Structures are given as structure tokens and as C-alpha cells.
A protein has these predicted regions:
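Acidic/polar-rich alpha-helix caps and helix-coil junctions
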Residues: 1-48, 82-246
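Short, cationic low-complexity segments
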Residues: 48-74, 128-135
Length: 246
């Protein structure tokens, strides 16, 4: 006990996924080290490559609570803005939408839309990104959770050049497992105690059970909120989300 601890804040949350070196990360229980030329991956390229990439669905977007903990209304009409400068000037941005939601959403997707006919360049103008290729996303909501601007674009946008470390077991998932177990046993207090650790890190209010109209699974409000937390915390985490769903 006490050997591991959650990283700090929304930025600490994202650092679990896009760090070039996870050594010393207090949340990591086990991770995989990547080094270009020895062992590499293509996760960043899958999120920013020149070919169209997959994106967040609108259904997933609406799973994120508002920043005050209330249920999302889905009424975002008239809240799109446009970028002021740079390559992306004049293109639609969703920064206001992200600011109104659970802060984890802004750590997971871009603040602007990118789709066919309206491509964008992430980290445009930053050192090492001068040759970055334009990217489009199937849904418009580009995945930025695993990306970082330090790796030059010639490696970021390559299937043999990504070297960010890969988390395997980390504390947040253990906390989610505890919360789910307590929820299944009907222990609301203990389930909430675990969920609130993650919400505090994200900058969200404590757990509040709500009668969500989106709950079409016939489960209790407690189970529904625990599953929401797991969905939001582990969004895009592939293997972890897959086993959560089956």
C-alpha cells in the first residue's frame, strides 16, 4: 500500500498515455518500453497519419458529463467556433464544447474538427512538425490522447517510428475494478469512494446517481454510473475497453 498513486490532474492523466518515458510514473504498475530502432509501435500514426483515421463517435461524446456533474443535454447548436490563425484558421473548433464537459474529454480528442474536405494539422507550427501531413477523421473528432508534439512528424506519422511507452497495468484500472465489484455487491458507499478518486483527479464533482434517459440496459443507476466512469476513463484503451464490453 502506498507504493502507487494517481498522477496529478488532467494533464497527469494524459501523461500515462503519451509519455516517451514512463519510468518514475507513480501510477504505473507495469509498462512496456519502446525505443526506435529496437522496438517501436504505430499508435501515434493511427491517430494523426495522412490517411483517414478513426475518431470518437457522437454517442461516446455524449457519455461525458458536464463539468458540474450534470447529464449532457446534447444541445450543442450554435456553440461551434472557428480557429483564428495558422494553418487551421477559419476551420471549426469545439473548444467551448470541451470546456463544458468532463476535462478528460479535452485530453482525449482535438479541440477542432477534421473531416474529409476539412483536414487539419495537429501541432501545426511547432518545432519538428514542419513536414506534418494533413489528417482527416472518420467522425471529425480526432484522437489526441496518445499523441505528443516532441517526436518529429517524420516519426510520429510513420508505422515504424513511434516510441511512446505503453501502459499495461496502472492504478486507475485497479480503482475502476474495485468500484465495479462494490457496485455489483450493492455497496454504493465503497463504489463511490473509488469512483471519486478518479473524478477528483479529473477535476469533476463527486459521484451523483441520476436517472439517465440513456440508460437502456436495465441496470441500476449505480451500475450505470460506474460503467460511464469506466468508459470515460479508459476511452480508446483498446484491449481494456474490449474486455469491459464483453
Amino acid at each position: 500500500a502506498g507504493q502507487f498513486a494517481l498522477t496529478d490532474g488532467a494533464e497527469g492523466y494524459r501523461a500515462n498515455y503519451n509519455s516517451l518515458d514512463l519510468a518514475g510514473n507513480k501510477e504505473m504498475i507495469m509498462y512496456k518500453k519502446y525505443v526506435v530502432g529496437l522496438l517501436y509501435h504505430a499508435t501515434q500514426d493511427y491517430c494523426c497519419g495522412s490517411t483517414q483515421t478513426n475518431g470518437l463517435s457522437r454517442s461516446a461524446f455524449n457519455a461525458y458529463l458536464m463539468k458540474d456533474g450534470s447529464l449532457p443535454t446534447g444541445d450543442d447548436k450554435g456553440r461551434l467556433g472557428t480557429a483564428d490563425e495558422g494553418y487551421n484558421a477559419g476551420k471549426p473548433v469545439i473548444i467551448d464544447l470541451l470546456d463544458a464537459r468532463d476535462p478528460r474529454l479535452a485530453q482525449q480528442i482535438d479541440g477542432y474538427l477534421g473531416y474529409v474536405g476539412n483536414g487539419r494539422i495537429r501541432y501545426e507550427g511547432m518545432p519538428g512538425q514542419e513536414t506534418a501531413a494533413e489528417n482527416t477523421v472518420s467522425t471529425g473528432y480526432g484522437i489526441t490522447k496518445f499523441d505528443e508534439p516532441v517526436t518529429p512528424s517524420k516519426f510520429r506519422q510513420a508505422t515504424n517510428g513511434n516510441e511512446t511507452d505503453g501502459p499495461i497495468f496502472w492504478l486507475a484500472e485497479i480503482i475502476l475494478n474495485n468500484a465495479e465489484a462494490y457496485a455489483e455487491l450493492g455497496n454504493e458507499a465503497k463504489a463511490a469512494e473509488n469512483i471519486n478518486k478518479l473524478r477528483a483527479r479529473a477535476g469533476m464533482p463527486t459521484l451523483k446517481l441520476q436517472n439517465d434517459p440513456a440508460n437502456n440496459m436495465g441496470v441500476s443507476d449505480l451500475i450505470w454510473e460506474v460503467r460511464r466512469e469506466r468508459r470515460v476513463e479508459l476511452m480508446f484503451d483498446l484491449n481494456d475497453r474490449y474486455w469491459s464490453l464483453i
